[in-house]
């Protein structure tokens, strides 16, 4: 039989105090909805239906054509939300997973185990449960003397005995699909919340003598539903440790997992070392044997093998093998550093292509430039690429020596093997094998300093 999935993503999430729909808040680089969607893939669903409502288009854009969508215009409870999928699924034969879009820690493995348990035990409904140290706020799983599930009781409807139960409903279920939609016709709003509870279908199945089971999670953390920023931070912490652990298993040294912020789609090669307080975001990819030292921050960066990045920022750039960056360097979007390049302390590079073995050791700005191989930038070099309205390009050949404190005013071309004298302002193209000097001639006026207040003779 086929598997199906319904993802509940219509809620506003008032306690988040945010303009974003709750499921759009991110955990480790992607939205909670995307985390859930990825985990759902483990059951190989023939169709996924996402129930949307608040700011529906934002939610729809996240999944695009990977899901069908149905609207829940009024928030009348989880049962009502599932009813919205009736037109898409009601006549289909198979098993339907129902899961909330704000449960980013649930794993695909657990969902696969849930489906297998449901099928193997021939249940009409199977509840995903967990044991909670503090079950307050959760629906409780009530069992009879034979350990069979008899019902789910919500917190506000639970009596004193039921509130002592530790086994909680995670809000994730598997149902026989056609039985689910038949039972939904019989639920009502006669409860403390005045809503259509999806949990009421469990009681309907039990009254009809149908088999209901429960599969208990091994890790309570997977059950976390995010309702506020506190829970969001908890989810982030758990996910961060999970990600760091997987990288360590794969041969990466993460010196302090508590302080490493690694997004879920980041790739890191073996023998690389991630020191404390490193942040790796987006689609960043790190090669083998690379060292990222304390405080480095990379966003959508492509980094090769045997690279050293010391307390620096790299954004949307390509760093080739053997490059050294930092400390305190800033590699801005659109930059490509070829093999063996050295970008030193307090150097900023933006939208530039830098050739092999080129060095900019300190206090330099290179913007909108194309630079050849074996170029040396002296300290204090500036490419002047912006006139207030337009950006202009600087082209520098190979084996060029740029003297310290040179100002290169674009558009400008400097040929191979050329050099600029220290302190020069270069406004014209420099031919191959030439030296360019663009500074005022020094004039010494002997004895002139005697008249100045700083001179000992004036004190």
UniProtKB/Swiss-Prot annotation:
Pathway membership, UniProt: Nucleotide-sugar biosynthesis; UDP-N-acetyl-alpha-D-glucosamine biosynthesis; N-acetyl-alpha-D-glucosamine 1-phosphate from alpha-D-glucosamine 6-phosphate (route II): step 2/2; Nucleotide-sugar biosynthesis; UDP-N-acetyl-alpha-D-glucosamine biosynthesis; UDP-N-acetyl-alpha-D-glucosamine from N-acetyl-alpha-D-glucosamine 1-phosphate: step 1/1; Bacterial outer membrane biogenesis; LPS lipid A biosynthesis
E.C. numbers: 2.7.7.23, 2.3.1.157
Cofactor: Mg(2+)
GO biological process terms held by the UniProt record: cell morphogenesis; cell wall organization; lipid A biosynthetic process; peptidoglycan biosynthetic process; regulation of cell shape; UDP-N-acetylglucosamine biosynthetic process
Binding site for Mg(2+): 102, 227
Catalysis performed (reactions): alpha-D-glucosamine 1-phosphate + acetyl-CoA = N-acetyl-alpha-D-glucosamine 1-phosphate + CoA + H(+); N-acetyl-alpha-D-glucosamine 1-phosphate + UTP + H(+) = UDP-N-acetyl-alpha-D-glucosamine + diphosphate
Cellular component GO terms held in the UniProt record: cytoplasm; membrane
Membrane-spanning ranges: none
First-tier enzyme category under EC: transferase
Active site annotation, chain numbering: 362
Spans annotated as Pyrophosphorylase: 1-229
Domain of life: Bacteria
Entries under InterPro entries matching the protein: Bifunctional_GlmU, GlmU-like, GlmU_C_LbH, Hexapep, NTP_transferase_dom, Nucleotide-diphossugar_trans, Trimer_LpxA-like_sf
Alphabetized UniProt keyword annotations: Acyltransferase, Cell shape, Cell wall biogenesis/degradation, Cytoplasm, Magnesium, Metal-binding, Multifunctional enzyme, Nucleotidyltransferase, Peptidoglycan synthesis, Repeat, Transferase
Region span, Linker: 230-250
Cofactor: binding details: Binds 1 Mg(2+) ion per subunit.
Binding locations of acetyl-CoA: 379, 385-386, 404, 422, 439
Keyword Cytoplasm in record: yes
Pfam family, one: NTP_transferase
GO molecular function ontology, one term from the record: magnesium ion binding
Region (N-acetyltransferase): 251-459
Functional summary from the UniProt entry: Catalyzes the last two sequential reactions in the de novo biosynthetic pathway for UDP-N-acetylglucosamine (UDP-GlcNAc). The C-terminal domain catalyzes the transfer of acetyl group from acetyl coenzyme A to glucosamine-1-phosphate (GlcN-1-P) to produce N-acetylglucosamine-1-phosphate (GlcNAc-1-P), which is converted into UDP-GlcNAc by the transfer of uridine 5-monophosphate (from uridine 5-triphosphate), a reaction catalyzed by the N-terminal domain.
Protein name from the UniProt record: Bifunctional protein GlmU
Classification of source organism: Bacteria, Bacillati, Bacillota, Bacilli, Lactobacillales
